[in-house]
Every structure is written in structure tokens, then in C-alpha cells.
């Protein structure tokens, strides 16, 4: 049985989530403390910090890792408003959607220099398959690349400051805010990047992928990071962070949304770049019993935009549906580069399904409806 937060709709199975004696999760508690934050003071801290890294025309002031999504569009807009000269860096996603390409081009039109690093697609497809079958995450190589490539760019272009968006795991401003020891280490990057227990070196020793094919997935050495003084900050620590308002600001600056709620979601303004995202989100549902619709519903419940009851109904309607398509692209075509059939994919799904949280028949087999959807044992506390 799943236990749910009494304020939002997040189950206790979410990694790093804790539900206290009152039945409230730590994410809701943390959000409640935001009203006590002096955002004016935080903004001044941000301006002071950014001032230390301004190059006054001699180089870029900072690196902004961007995907083309609403949040990275917002980050670029804010950096420009604050008078910085950012270098935008993209580690191109696995299966870039047309709308994702459009939003990347839109960021360029905001008036920034832009580096787009596209991985070897044959190697990436192998890594997608390895990630999916070994750790249940088709997006494993993408999640590695979005941290390694900006760090490599920082070293290569001698730009110490990396400006990330929101840090969902830690309530702090990032290493750049530290009075000392503020240079990123390889260990910090690997821990923050979240490798899910599979190291890049494993790929060479176990799967025969040569190190020369994995350069973009490896962090710079500590010596390289120290030489440049690479550090980073999280913009969401210094400015109030809200996905919906970020989306509205991004839209006002040319960002394009989908023509309907994205499959498995409840909104049309996020995760628009990669056709593989539906698979990634579905595996989160299989492992932990929640997915994208739950994530978004919780954000809106905490901000009093929807009631908890409405959130429960939205989650039941949208969360964890079998990913037959994403952004309109059929599952079979998404799996083609991985050389995997839909039947093979379903077998992998079953291997990673947490059978303790889904309904089964008398023989222990998972119960699925005619669309292949699972049903959780419970969608709320009894």
C-alpha cells in the first residue's frame, strides 16, 4: 500500500521524500517556509555574486545550460535582464521533437551566443538501450550529458560560473555562494548529476564502448576544474521559482507550447523537447507509483491553484498511462533507434515494475486494461 502526503498527492515512495508524524511531506514543509524568505535580500545576494564573475566584455560572464524548455528560456531572460552576457550551452537531447527545435532556435533569437553539442547518435542509441534495460532509465545518457557538457564548456571557454535553474534536492544557492571551497569537484558533479549507480567507466569495461566514444559523458578532471575555478549557482534559490510563471514569461518571449496536454501530463508547457520523455516518466511510475501528472499537481496544490481532491482526480486520469505515443510520435518509432520492438519494451517494463504497489491476479501477474495500463492498489490514504 502507498502512503500519501496529506497536503499534496505525492506517495512515500518518491526518493528522498519524508512524511512526518502529521502526515505532511518535507516538500510541502519546505514550500511553506518560502513565505519567510526575504526575496529582496536574496536578490541582492544574487547581484553581488554575479558581480564577482562579470567579465566586462573580455569574455562571457556565465554559462547557462539550456534545453529550450520553459525554465531555461526563463533563466536566459533573467540573465539578460540583469545585464549579463551569457554563453548558452545545450547538450542536444536524444530524440529532439520539432517543437523542441523551435524553442531552441527561439532562445538564440533572444540575443545570446549559443553552443549546441550533438552526440554521436549511434552511440547515444546504444546508451539509451543500456540505460533502459540496465537501470530502467532511457534518459540516463541525456541526464549525464546535461551536466558534463556545461562543465566541459566552462573549462574549454574559461567561463567559471554556471547558472542552473532550480535545485530540487537541496535548499541552498549552490557552491558559488560558499565563502571558500566553492570550486566544483568531479565528485560533487557526479553526485548532483545522479548516475543511478552506473558509471561511465562501466560502459567501456562491460559494454565495449570505447572511451573515445564517451568523451561528452565524462566530467573534466579536478585539475581542470580548479584551473578555471568552475563553480555554479541555482537561480531558484535567489529568485522565486514557479514553473507556471516561468512558462508565461517564456511564452511572452516566443516560447511555443504544445497544442494539448502532453501525454501523461496535465499541462502543455513542459517536457516538449524529447520524444523519449514519455518512456522516462512511465518508468518512474512503474518504480515508484507516480509520474509527471503527480509532480505537476503537487506544485499547483502547494500554490493553492487546485484543491487536493482535484489533484487526486487529475492524477488518476493522466498519471502513468502506457506511453503509446509522446508529442504525437508513436512508441514503435521512438524505439526504432534502440532496435527494440514494442513487445520487448513491455517485457523490460514488467522487469522494473514494483509489483507491491500495483494490482495483480491470483497468480501474481500484473493486471492491465486493454490499453496496457496498470492500476495502483490505492490512489489515496484509506
Q: What are the language-model segments listed below?
A:
Residues 74-76:
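Long, structured ligand/cofactor-binding scaffold of large enzymes
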Residues 62-71:
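Short, glycine-rich nucleotide/cofactor-binding loops
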Residues 1-62, 78-382:
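Nucleotide-activated chemistry modules centered on ATP-dependent adenylation/adenylyltransferase
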Amino acid at each position: 500500500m502507498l502512503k500519501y502526503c496529506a497536503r499534496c498527492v505525492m506517495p512515500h515512495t518518491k526518493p528522498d521524500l519524508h512524511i512526518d508524524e502529521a502526515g505532511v511531506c518535507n516538500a510541502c514543509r519546505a514550500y511553506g517556509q518560502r513565505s519567510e524568505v526575504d526575496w529582496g535580500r536574496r536578490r541582492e545576494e544574487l547581484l553581488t555574486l554575479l558581480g564577482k564573475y562579470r567579465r566586462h566584455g573580455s569574455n562571457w560572464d556565465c554559462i547557462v545550460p539550456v534545453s529550450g524548455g520553459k525554465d531555461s528560456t526563463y533563466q536566459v531572460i533573467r540573465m539578460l535582464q540583469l545585464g549579463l552576457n551569457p554563453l548558452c550551452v545545450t547538450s542536444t537531447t536524444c530524440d529532439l521533437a520539432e517543437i523542441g527545435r523551435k524553442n531552441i532556435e527561439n532562445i538564440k533569437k533572444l540575443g545570446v551566443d549559443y553552443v549546441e553539442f550533438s552526440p554521436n547518435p549511434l552511440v547515444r542509441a546504444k546508451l539509451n538501450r543500456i540505460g533502459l534495460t540496465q537501470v530502467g532509465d532511457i534518459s540516463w545518457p541525456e541526464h549525464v550529458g546535461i551536466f558534463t557538457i556545461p562543465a566541459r564548456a566552462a573549462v574549454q571557454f574559461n567561463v567559471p560560473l554556471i547558472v542552473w535553474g532550480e535545485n530540487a534536492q537541496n535548499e541552498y544557492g549552490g557552491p558559488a555562494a560558499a565563502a571558500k571551497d566553492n570550486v566544483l569537484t568531479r565528485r560533487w558533479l557526479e553526485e548532483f548529476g545522479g548516475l543511478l549507480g552506473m558509471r561511465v567507466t562501466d560502459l567501456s569495461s562491460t559494454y565495449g564502448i570505447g572511451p573515445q566514444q564517451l568523451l561528452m559523458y565524462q566530467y573534466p578532471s579536478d585539475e581542470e576544474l580548479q584551473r578555471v575555478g568552475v563553480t555554479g549557482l541555482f537561480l531558484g534559490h535567489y529568485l522565486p521559482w514557479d514553473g507556471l510563471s516561468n512558462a508565461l514569461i517564456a511564452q511572452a518571449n516566443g516560447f511555443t507550447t504544445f497544442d494539448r496536454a502532453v501525454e501523461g501530463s496535465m499541462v502543455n508547457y513542459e517536457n516538449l523537447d524529447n520524444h523519449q520523455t514519455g518512456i522516462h516518466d512511465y518508468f518512474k511510475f512503474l518504480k515508484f507509483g507516480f509520474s509527471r501528472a503527480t509532480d505537476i499537481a503537487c506544485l499547483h496544490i502547494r500554490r493553492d491553484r487546485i484543491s487536493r481532491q482535484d489533484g487526486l482526480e487529475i492524477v488518476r486520469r493522466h498519471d502513468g498511462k502506457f506511453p503509446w505515443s509522446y508529442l504525437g510520435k508513436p512508441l514503435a518509432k521512438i524505439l526504432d533507434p534502440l532496435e527494440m520492438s514494442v513487445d520487448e519494451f513491455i517485457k523490460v517494463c514488467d522487469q522494473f515494475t514494483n509489483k507491491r504497489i500495483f494490482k495483480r491476479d491470483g497468480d501474481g501477474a500484473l493486471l492491465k486494461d486493454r490499453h496496457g495500463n496498470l492500476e495502483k492498489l490505492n490512489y489515496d490514504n484509506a
